[in-house]
Amino acid sequence: MKKKIWKSSASIEDLIKRSNIISNIRLFFSKKNILEVETPILSRSTVTDVHLTSFETNYISSDNIDELKLWLTTSPEYHMKRLLASESGSIYQICHSFRNKEIGRYHNPEFTMLEWYQPFCSMKKFIKEIDIFLQIILKCNKSDKVSYQDLFIDFLKIDPLCTNLLELHQISKKLKLDHLTHSENNLNKLIQLLFTLKIEPNIGKEKPLFVYHFPAEQASLAAINLKDPRISERFEIFFKGIELGNGFYELIDVNEQKKRFIRDNKERRSMNLPTRKIDNFFLSALSYGLPPCSGVAIGLDRLIMLILNKKSIHEVIAFPVDRC
């Protein structure tokens, strides 16, 4: 019988449950007096991150003369940080974000994200706050915490902070991954590949796991650790072998942030990817003064998928890309 692809891929019963979960999330933040905000999903700039591909469109003036290139946001991060610089205090947002070239069991080009920022909050304290959130919403046990370095030592018997190409190629061959790694000579890319294929699917099985202090090369928009410049103040959350969230003790140094954007575009050129215009509104906010803060982005579709014991986020979204 032909599939009724006009229908929702999620059952109405599950969509009601989804709505209730999101209501409970809003209640959690309301009780903590954290402000819910709304920011644009269209932006004049986009991210420079080489791992993200943005959707673009054009605004056309009514006389059809002027065009303005706009981007669908991959996350609300830059706009929310501009609010933080405007002294918003603690804020959160539940919104749709958009990432091209992403489809699969845990991916849809349009997805729902929870983004949350706490000014004057250390990474360690913020992880405790998120842990409480997960216990309430997921109804799970208290999470575990482990450093990125210790995770590699436990699983692969190598130290990612002082390894070398020879050692990484040897372990890749031992793990029968050499068909993927034999031509790769970028240390950081090899480390990320090993993490994704051999560690990530096997962690957080019984309860959520926070992996913190990612290598400095993977800092993204996180600050570098003051005591050890080899590591960043970045963490990720895993549960049942799935990445649920990505967080930082945020970088607030405008000059360092600009250097990272430039470095991203340099890497884009080397990979034959289009360079991206740097978001000067965001840099101006950093220059004005972003308060010391921690933030996290959590994939709500994945979170709801786990709560409802589904195997794909497409089972908790009404109309994923194949039905939209």
UniProtKB/Swiss-Prot annotation:
Q: What is its EC number?
A: 6.3.2.-
Q: Which reaction does it catalyse?
A: D-beta-lysine + L-lysyl-[protein] + ATP = N(6)-((3R)-3,6-diaminohexanoyl)-L-lysyl-[protein] + AMP + diphosphate + H(+)
Query: Disulphide bridges in this chain?
Result: none
In alphabetical order, the GO MF annotations are: acid-ammonia (or amide) ligase activity; ATP binding; lysine-tRNA ligase activity; tRNA binding
Instruction: Name a biological process GO annotation.
Output: lysyl-tRNA aminoacylation
Q: Which domain of life is it from?
A: Bacteria
Q: Which UniProt keywords apply?
A: ATP-binding, Ligase, Nucleotide-binding
Q: Do you know which InterPro entries this protein is assigned to? A: Aa-tRNA-synt_II, aa-tRNA-synth_II, aa-tRNA-synth_II/BPL/LPL, EpmA, Lys-tRNA-synth_II_C
Q: Which GO terms describe its cellular component?
A: cytosol
The record lists ATP as bound by 99-101, 108, 243-244, 299
One Pfam family assigned to this protein is tRNA-synt_2
SUPFAM superfamilies recorded: Class II aaRS and biotin synthetases
* Residues the entry annotates as binding substrate: 75-77, 117, 250
Q: How does it assemble?
A: Homodimer.
So what does this one do? With EpmB is involved in the beta-lysylation step of the post-translational modification of translation elongation factor P (EF-P). Catalyzes the ATP-dependent activation of (R)-beta-lysine produced by EpmB, forming a lysyl-adenylate, from which the beta-lysyl moiety is then transferred to the epsilon-amino group of a conserved specific lysine residue in EF-P.
Query: To which protein family does this belong?
Result: Belongs to the class-II aminoacyl-tRNA synthetase family. EpmA subfamily.
Q: What is this protein called?
A: Elongation factor P--(R)-beta-lysine ligase
Task: State the species of origin.
Answer: Buchnera aphidicola subsp. Acyrthosiphon pisum (strain APS) (Acyrthosiphon pisum symbiotic bacterium)
Provide the organism lineage as a comma list.
Answer: Bacteria, Pseudomonadati, Pseudomonadota, Gammaproteobacteria, Enterobacterales
Q: Which gene encodes it?
A: epmA
